[in-house]
Amino acid sequence: MNVKYIGLSEINGPLVALDHVSGISYDEMAEIKLDDGTRRLARVVEVEKDRAVLQVFEGTKGLSLVNTTTSFQGKPMELALSTEMLGRIFSGAGKPIDGLGEIFPEKYRDINGSPLNPVSRTYPRNYINTGISSIDALTTLIRGQKLPIFSGSGLSHNKLAVQIVRQAKIADENGQDFAIVFGAMGVKNDVADYFKRCFEETGVLQRVAMFLNLSNDPIIERILTPRCALTCAEYLAFEHDMHILVILTDMTSYAEALREFSSSKGEIPGRKGYPGYLYSDLASIYERAGIVKGAKGSVTQIPILTMPNDDITHPVPDLTGYITEGQIVLDRNLDQTGVYPAVSILPSLSRLMKDGIGEGYTREDHQMVSNQLFAAYAKVQDARSLASVIGEEELADTDKAYLKFGTLFEKHFIDQGFDVNRSIDETLDLGWSLLSTLPKSELDRVDEEHLEHYYSAEKAKALFAED
């Protein structure tokens, strides 16, 4: 029997409270009917004895304590799912906003997902090619991995997200499809328009399902956005055998919405005002990436977050780093010199990279090239520090060679432009050309066989003659 409750006990910001209710569950959906017949959706966010607190999706403006009618639906929020979602644009709550009408649902699923038994997970292997050298060679993205991008306010993370969406691909295995689910939280209208325009102009929108939550949309919708996006991804991956890449931006906006939501409920704040359950809440999102035994599809995540004041110890990047399997860090100093993408190589890493590259996946020399580029670039930083103290002219020849390598590495390897899409072979060959500008004796992370095969000082000299 569907019981309707007339009247509200309290209205406080986006929250409403009802007393003398029974049989109500946490996270249950409800429909609120106003005096004028308008209907709004709400979600139960707190239950205590016979009192329930609900958050209204569209806000509480116009609600009355007396005549408002509330009916509970007896189930959590569910998302209508279909393969038709690819090529469509949805609100953060999963409603179509592209003017193309409703989708015809094949199934409905709880947006909170089903918890994955750790024993049923398969270790992620094989890689996703992004066409971006600094990612593919040095912080390789593996299928089923969760690899965040740590950015800062004003850096080019939106541009990088668009490039990844446009260029990302997998090696074709058994004709399996690859698609992208893109979730944007708290973005401005111009940024949302930029995403839509870029996807439409490049023709990739047909393989993308977009979930857009704008900065002026309700915060409860911002909290729902990543869950709706991941529910869509899980459906396509595990029921239609597709490989899905989920890009979520900006997780800092999500965390701030969670902080505001927690504050409105009167909860005791933790670090920097964020709720004490921020870690477990973020984990409930990030841990939905992976590969399941017996399933042919996979869900890979790239959460993007902006670090307030470029502080990597801020609670959001700090906790994200604990949960995820590496990070790609963008550097403001590189960005200011015009380098794009401004990936800071040394603090970036991919913890699952070693098991998804090499012979049979990318190329047999991939790990060695990656290790040697990391080691050489670390020595570049040492040489630059020394040069700032004693002057470049006083450096040894080896240190001068590293300074030149660093300049060439940033100019030709890290900086590759928005429209450049490199294959893994092109990336590794470029890495060898750069390493060939160094004395052969300095390349101690590469075995002799590959050194003889790929090292060519003459080729490097001709390639970088203008530099």
PLM region descriptions:
Residues 1-4, 10-130:
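Acidic-enriched and Gly/Ser
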Residues 175-194, 211, 215, 226, ...:
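Conserved P-loop NTPase motor core
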Residues 221-258:
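Phosphate-binding/switch loop-helix module in NTP-utilizing enzymes
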Residues 155-206:
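Conserved P-loop
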Residues 68-70, 77, 84, 96-146, ...:
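P-loop NTPase nucleotide-binding/switch module
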Residues 253-254, 260-467:
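Conserved catalytic/coupling modules of large nucleotide/cofactor-utilizing molecular machines
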Residues 151-152:
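The Walker A (P-loop) glycine that initiates the GxxxxGKT/S ATP-binding motif of P-loop NTPases
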Residues 140-142, 168-176, 200-205, 235-240, ...:
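Conserved catalytic network of the ASCE P-loop NTPase/AAA+ motor domain
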